[in-house]
Amino acid sequence: CNVITFHNPVRLAEDIALLDQLSNGRVEVGIGRGIYGREAINMNKEADLKDQAKNFRLFEETLTIMKKAWTEKFFSHKGEFYTYPTPNFTWQHDMSPPSEDFLDTKTNEIKKISVVPKPKQQPHPPIWQVVDGARSIEWAAQNGLNTIMWIPTVKALKTRFEIYRDAKSKAENRDVPLGEGVSLVRDMFVAETMEEAEKLAGQHIVNYMKWVCHWRGLGNHMDPGEELPETKHKLDLLNYDFLHKRNLLFGTPEYVVNKINELKSELNLQNLQVWSNFPGIDHKACMRSIKLFNDEVIPK
């Protein structure tokens, strides 16, 4: 997964295409705009999250260039942030015969560039955009992208899934089933007992969510129309019990199976990504959790 606004689009497209070739066409590309301002301003000043509209324009243009690089033998681009090739650059080399495919043969000025190799998958690997708000969800559907969602409750996710389904159905002129093109990320820790899961991982996930919610608040954790009591500090309500009932796959194998089945029955969930190595988790405990998930959850 890449925060594409932080990267040169031609370099990123080339790296992904090469990886797709090396993996024999098994790459799936995750993309996002970024959520942390201190990263954005240091990686690419044009991606500064203080200007969300500009950040989105950069995101859109970057993705456009990547798709051109993957799908066109030679391509050019002139946009707000990038121009390819660089204007007025001439090229002459005895071992590189001039071609009208990419060169003005009268002036030797390069008119187009290319990325080699192209991806193994054609026209390009599947693209998954991390989304949250309705506008981003609709944009992804309208532009042929799959989506990745993370925190919301089942009730809140239902609305998001429906927005994506409706926009994708309209864009593709077909009845898209609920759940198609959506992948859900859930924080997961499996243990022998509910108490052990909380003891080994509870405070670590709370600490991590406090980090995330410092910027985002608790809104993404709430059901539609839910109102929380006022507190002195915005994160006073954020504890294990608050999180567990809303969006955690923390508990016994049986409990986790039941929660996944709920996601399938309510959302027709087709793609689940589990996040199990969040900050603070003991490595052995994490690996034990993954083994329990593999042995006692996946088969059911």
Question: Would you name each region that the model predicts?
Answer:
Residues 3, 35, 151-154, 275-286:
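Glycine-rich, proline-tolerant flexible connector loops at the mouths of alpha/beta enzymes
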Residues 4-21, 250-258:
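Glycine-rich anion/phosphate-binding loops
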Residues 15, 131-138, 255-262:
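Short, acidic/polar
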Residues 19, 66, 127, 140, ...:
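Conserved, mostly hydrophobic/aromatic
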Residues 26-30, 126-128, 146-148, 179-183, ...:
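Structural preference for beta-strand elements that scaffold enzyme active sites
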Residues 52-118, 155-269:
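An alpha-helical appendage that flanks or caps ligand/catalytic pockets
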Residues 130-156, 160-161:
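A conserved active-site cap/scaffold subdomain adjacent to cofactor or substrate pockets
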Residues 190-195, 282-292:
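Short glycine/threonine-rich loop-to-helix capping motif typified by GTGT followed
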